[in-house]
Curated annotation (Swiss-Prot):
SOCS family proteins form part of a classical negative feedback system that regulates cytokine signal transduction. SOCS3 is involved in negative regulation of cytokines that signal through the JAK/STAT pathway. Inhibits cytokine signal transduction by binding to tyrosine kinase receptors including IL6ST/gp130, LIF, erythropoietin, insulin, IL12, GCSF and leptin receptors. Binding to JAK2 inhibits its kinase activity and regulates IL6 signaling. Suppresses fetal liver erythropoiesis. Regulates onset and maintenance of allergic responses mediated by T-helper type 2 cells. GO terms for biological process: animal organ regeneration; branching involved in labyrinthine layer morphogenesis; cell differentiation; cell surface receptor signaling pathway via JAK-STAT; cellular response to interleukin-17; cellular response to leukemia inhibitory factor; cellular response to thyrotropin-releasing hormone; cellular response to type II interferon. This is Suppressor of cytokine signaling 3. Residues 22-33 are annotated as: Kinase inhibitory region (KIR). PANTHER family: PHOSPHATIDYLINOSITOL 3-KINASE REGULATORY SUBUNIT, SUPPRESSOR OF CYTOKINE SIGNALING 3. One of its GO terms (molecular function) is protein tyrosine kinase inhibitor activity. InterPro entries: SH2, SH2_dom_sf, SOCS3_SH2, SOCS3_SOCS_box, SOCS_box, SOCS_box-like_dom_sf. PROSITE patterns: SH2, SOCS. Interacts with multiple activated proteins of the tyrosine kinase signaling pathway including IGF1 receptor, insulin receptor and JAK2. Binding to JAK2 is mediated through the KIR and SH2 domains to a phosphorylated tyrosine residue within the JAK2 JH1 domain. Binds specific activated tyrosine residues of the leptin, EPO, IL12, GSCF and gp130 receptors. Interaction with CSNK1E stabilize SOCS3 protein. Component of the probable ECS(SOCS3) E3 ubiquitin-protein ligase complex which contains CUL5, RNF7/RBX2, Elongin BC complex and SOCS3. Interacts with CUL5, RNF7, ELOB and ELOC. Keywords: Growth regulation, Phosphoprotein, SH2 domain, Signal transduction inhibitor, Ubl conjugation pathway.
Amino acid sequence: MVTHSKFPAAGMSRPLDTSLRLKTFSSKSEYQLVVNAVRKLQESGFYWSAVTGGEANLLLSAEPAGTFLIRDSSDQRHFFTLSVETQSGTKNLRIQCEGGSFSLQSDPRSTQPVPRFDCVLKLVHHYMPPPGAPSFSLPPTEPSFEVQEQPPAQALPGGTPKRAYYIYSGGEKIPLVLSRPLSSNVATLQHLCRKTVNGHLDSYEKVTQLPGPIREFLDQYDAPL
């Protein structure tokens, strides 16, 4: 078993401090998975590192529903937490890391497979609505920390199935909507350009046609958000 420390603050490029982290890694591969996730999160601009749940609530409470951030989890069993402002206040969803992938904590009674990803950014992007998708509106409900997927009921323009995810509590539900990350720092022009390019590279062939240095730069952060 390998134990490592809390991650450095967002936007900082120094190596990980390996003295204080309480969460235990199950393997070297899991350690590397998390290190890569932290590196990309630090470049994302919406990783708030060691802010607490209360601090996340204060940050998000003045923002519109759908605003979110990623922070270190205060639960020693998890590395990261997704904090999102909803129509019933701020919700904190634990991001599980197991089996070489990340996933949102889900209802254990659900029979549907939980979407899993090798990167926290890919997980966040999965739960963001595609362009042109409608916003969901439901009455407020009690806080909850579990997510379920509702199968697609109709298709978006272009034939893409529309999937909705809900946070459940006491038999009620509120929509999980991730529409805008809350920035923790000012992004560089290079990073903004990289996100734009990532959002328009819809095939591997397009990537291979780019010059080597540009491909390497894109590989370091391969998400459009």
